[in-house]
Amino acid sequence: MNEVSYKEISNEEEGQRLDNYLIRILKGVPKSHIYRIIRGGEVRVNKKRAQVSSRLHAGDSIRIPPIRL
């Protein structure tokens, strides 16, 4: 991923933790990198910094930064 992307949470994805959701959609990205970008405030949920253990709700907008490994 070379650019910022936005994902909207569907009813089927509701209730998942943010870290588990990102691990599932960002295949090939190490878990340690995913945790680092969440803790660093680069991942936003509804334009706010999110915690690793945040639960997602239907309609939430997730901002995912460019992934550089």
Task: Locate each region found by the language model.
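S4-like RNA-binding module at protein N-termini
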Residues: M1-L69
